[in-house]
């Protein structure tokens, strides 16, 4: 195997692929990246057995075909440390990878390509194409609500659902829920649901960088695959049943609060400073046109903010985890935000003021 490549052309896919590779691995080959040269194309593959990413680069000069695996992090660090527009020469000699650039020479250990595991694929049961920016929006709007290391393993990921042409993302950790939908013109009669694990979602989001580009999605029985011109991403799915999110959405809330998102965000952030560090509870007191936000902590310290809001329901007092409210206000894009409440024991439903494609549910706290 032998090829030459510009530093930038190699570094971009190498950084993406190395992101999938975990530093501490049970199998040494999983710390490696698989390099394959075929014709005028170099492909780089990284995997942790859950998630697999293949990056592709077109080689400008003639290349000798071959395949080998080398330590991903070391190869990436070498590329990063080389000068910007240098030409890198890479060849395999006597089971070592020789990397030459300018006056620099590196020799890396290798493992055979045959040792490199591939993520098994079954047949795809649903294929569709969608703008990268749209899929990125679905992920960005909801990924913060995914659980981390929850024993209910099906919450450590995101539900992607195709139903009647609509693509929807849903994430919940049991305390709050985030949901975003968009019309994707996907020709699917049946409701189709998959749970993509947390790492898969976060890696996929990193790849969706082109504003105008499309991404092809294949949903299978056990895998999701996403393909663009430059990469192919595969992730195993979480085998489990996602909660019925529609039952979680509060119905019949009769108290509507409309406020300035940035004002509320700043007021919540300031109040949070003196909330209980462990439970993060704040108290909201609503009266005509006014929201009073209060927090206190075991040291008997107190914070209080008053924010003008549109509200004409009766007086209401309700407690929330301030971190959950700040997370929601952090992803909402409009200037105004709507809270729909019913009583002090019921969850809040949060929307953008003039847009219903996203919905957020936050459970109340007893204070």
Swiss-Prot record:
The keyword Ribosomal protein does not apply. InterPro entries: DNA_clamp_sf, DNA_polIII_beta, DNA_polIII_beta_C, DNA_polIII_beta_cen, DNA_polIII_beta_N. GO terms for cellular component: cytoplasm; DNA polymerase III complex. The keyword Transferase applies. It is found in: Cytoplasm. Pfam families: DNA_pol3_beta (PF00712), DNA_pol3_beta_2 (PF02767), DNA_pol3_beta_3 (PF02768). One of its GO terms (molecular function) is DNA-directed DNA polymerase activity. Forms a ring-shaped head-to-tail homodimer around DNA which binds and tethers DNA polymerases and other proteins to the DNA. The DNA replisome complex has a single clamp-loading complex (3 tau and 1 each of delta, delta', psi and chi subunits) which binds 3 Pol III cores (1 core on the leading strand and 2 on the lagging strand) each with a beta sliding clamp dimer. Additional proteins in the replisome are other copies of gamma, psi and chi, Ssb, DNA helicase and RNA primase. This is Beta sliding clamp.
């Amino acid at each position: 195997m032998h090829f030459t490549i510009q530093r930038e052309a190699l570094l971009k896919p190498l950084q993406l692929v190395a992101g999938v590779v975990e530093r501490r691995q049970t199998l040494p080959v999983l710390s490696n990246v698989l390099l394959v040269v075929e014709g005028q194309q170099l492909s780089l593959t990284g995997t942790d057995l859950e998630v697999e990413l293949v990056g592709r680069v077109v080689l400008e000069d003639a290349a000798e075909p071959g395949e080998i695996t080398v330590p991903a992090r070391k190869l990436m660090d070498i590329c990063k440390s080389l000068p910007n527009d240098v030409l890198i020469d890479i060849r395999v000699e006597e089971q070592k990878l020789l990397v030459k650039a300018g006056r620099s020479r590196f020799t890396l250990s290798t493992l055979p390509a045959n040792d490199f595991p591939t993520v098994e694929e079954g047949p795809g049961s649903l294929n569709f194409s969608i703008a990268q920016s749209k899929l990125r929006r679905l992920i960005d709007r909801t990924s913060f609500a995914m659980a981390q290391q929850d024993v209910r393993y099906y919450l450590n990921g995101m539900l992607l659902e195709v139903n009647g042409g609509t693509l929807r993302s849903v994430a919940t950790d049991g305390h709050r829920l985030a949901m975003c939908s968009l019309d994707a013109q996907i020709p699917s009669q049946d409701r189709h649901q998959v749970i993509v694990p947390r790492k898969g979602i976060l890696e996929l989001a990193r790849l969706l960088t082109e504003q105008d580009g499309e991404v092809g999605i294949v949903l299978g029985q056990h895998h999701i695959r996403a393909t663009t011109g430059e990469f192919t991403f595969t992730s195993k799915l979480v085998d489990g049943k996602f909660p019925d999110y529609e039952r979680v959405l509060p119905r019949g809330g009769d108290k509507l609060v409309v406020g300035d998102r940035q004002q509320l965000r700043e007021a919540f952030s300031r109040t949070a400073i003196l909330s209980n560090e462990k439970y993060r509870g704040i108290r909201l007191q609503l009266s005509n046109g006014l929201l009073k936000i209060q927090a206190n902590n075991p040291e008997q310290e107190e914070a209080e903010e008053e924010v003008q809001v549109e509200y004409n329901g009766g007086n209401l007092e309700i407690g929330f985890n301030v971190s959950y409210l700040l997370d929601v206000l952090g992803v909402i894009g409009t200037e105004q935000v709507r809270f729909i409440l019913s009583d002090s024991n019921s969850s809040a439903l949060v929307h953008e003021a003039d847009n219903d494609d996203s919905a957020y549910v936050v459970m109340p706290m007893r204070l």
